[in-house]
């Protein structure tokens, strides 16, 4: 009996010691977040939730965002995956260990999403090791941070109308009856819901993840291939399985291959800098159509990254400095429409871009910052980022996803 009592007392003491150690560990975690940066995106996201404890994401601190307040019951039940080491150039960098449910992320956008202008050579320091981010885009960075499947569905030069059409938010239809014979091409007309002719440069929809055959679309759940000649559109069946003729009727919906195949849990949208909209309300309606088509309410809206006087709505502004890191007219409209789902990416890049990738500001950067402009070291040209800029952009998207509880 006494022996049993001693055993029980010992167990209680051991449990108490364990709880004390865990408590000390949790306390250390909260008091020693890298760089002590609790505001994260708050400077560039006016409506951020003050209850969230947020740290900047830096190369030294890819997991600094994990807080108990943000942990949901689903997170606690999710399987813990030890992320494998990823070979980056000649250096192996550990991704660490994160808790998440395996999800898919679809990044739809234009050349900014595609990653036009990424650097041939770009390196930063990660945990004392050199990390090669040459050629990285923001979806690459997002995949690095989350460990999830990320689709780069960016196409250079596309307008917001074209992106929304490619994603399926704005629908396409067969304009008139046509018969497609096996192995033969026939002219076809495709229109939108208003009857306007549709001619996309990329009908398969995959953009940066374009390892598929060109211009594949689904009509009535059958795969077809489109071709262009003399400003006309032609269609034929895809593959060798079709033996007879296929009759396509007027009004049948046409869906890009990517819109058909990619059923993402999380949507990240970036568009508008190439036009395709005549009012902020029209652009917002395009975003909303894409969100509705996706079937998910887990989405992030990335604000335009151009300096105000170089943006699509540049006539609204006399100088960049008058706007600074405040929301401009365009950003205000998006924030009012989408609330906490919106990132003022331009302001983030001004306030935190250089710090996120560990770059010291040059004289030109300091001049840019003083005049409310995105630092030159992050850019390839006036509108596109280099890999440092895209890395910082991806880190900001990751942080927003943390705030929203997406990963």
Question: Positions of the model-derived regions?
Answer:
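Histidine-centered active-site loop/cap adjacent to the catalytic His
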Residues: 150, 163, 363-407
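Catalytic phosphate/metal-binding cores of nucleic-acid and nucleotide-processing enzymes, i.e., regions
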Residues: 108, 112, 143, 265-266, ...
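Mobile gating loops/cap/lid regions near enzyme active sites that modulate substrate access
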Residues: 347-373
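Structural recognition of the beta-strand scaffold that forms the well-ordered cores
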Residues: 104-113, 149-154, 265-271, 298-303, ...
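Serine-esterase "nucleophile elbow" of acetyl-processing enzymes
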Residues: 46-263, 322
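Surface-exposed cleft-lining segments at the edges of enzyme active sites
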Residues: 269-282, 305-306, 315-319
């Amino acid at each position: 009996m006494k022996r049993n009592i001693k055993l029980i007392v010992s167990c209680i003491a051991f449990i108490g010691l364990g709880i004390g150690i865990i408590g000390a560990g949790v306390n250390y975690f909260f008091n020693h977040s890298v760089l002590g940066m609790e505001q994260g995106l708050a400077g560039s996201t006016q409506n951020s939730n003050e209850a969230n404890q947020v740290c900047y994401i830096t190369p030294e601190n890819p997991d600094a965002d994990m807080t108990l307040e943000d942990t949901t019951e689903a997170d606690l039940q999710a399987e813990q995956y030890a992320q494998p080491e990823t070979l980056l150039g000649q250096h192996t960098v550990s991704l660490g260990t994160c808790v998440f449910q395996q999800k898919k992320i679809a990044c739809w956008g234009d050349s900014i999403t595609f990653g036009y202008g990424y650097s041939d050579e770009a390196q930063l320091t990660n945990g004392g090791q050199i990390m090669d981010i040459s050629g990285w885009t923001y979806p690459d960075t997002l995949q690095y941070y989350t460990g999830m499947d990320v689709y780069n569905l960016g196409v250079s030069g596309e307008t917001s109308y074209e992106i929304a059409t490619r994603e399926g938010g704005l629908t396409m239809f067969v304009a008139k009856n046509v018969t497609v014979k096996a192995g033969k091409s026939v002219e076809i007309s495709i229109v939108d819901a208003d009857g306007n002719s549709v001619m996309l440069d990329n009908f398969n929809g995959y953009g940066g993840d374009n390892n598929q055959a060109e211009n594949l679309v689904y009509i009535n759940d059958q795969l077809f291939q489109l071709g262009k000649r003399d400003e006309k559109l032609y269609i034929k069946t895809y593959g060798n399985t079709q033996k007879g003729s296929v009759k396509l009727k007027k009004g049948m919906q046409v869906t890009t291959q990517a819109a058909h195949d990619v059923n993402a849990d999380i949507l990240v949208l970036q568009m508008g800098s190439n036009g395709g909209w005549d009012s902020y309300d029209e652009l917002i309606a395009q975003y909303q159509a894409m969100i509705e088509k996706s079937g998910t309410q887990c989405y992030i809206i990335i604000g335009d990254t151009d300096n105000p006087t170089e943006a699509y709505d540049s006539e609204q502004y006399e100088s960049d400095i008058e706007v600074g890191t405040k929301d401009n007219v365009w950003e205000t409209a998006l924030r009012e429409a989408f609330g906490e789902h919106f990132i003022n990416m331009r302001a983030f890049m001004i306030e935190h871009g250089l710090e996120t990738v560990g770059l010291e500001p040059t004289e030109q950067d300091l001049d840019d910052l003083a005049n409310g402009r995105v630092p030159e070291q992050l850019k390839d040209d006036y509108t596109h980022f280099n890999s440092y800029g895209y890395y910082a952009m991806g880190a900001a998207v990751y942080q927003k996803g943390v705030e929203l509880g997406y990963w």
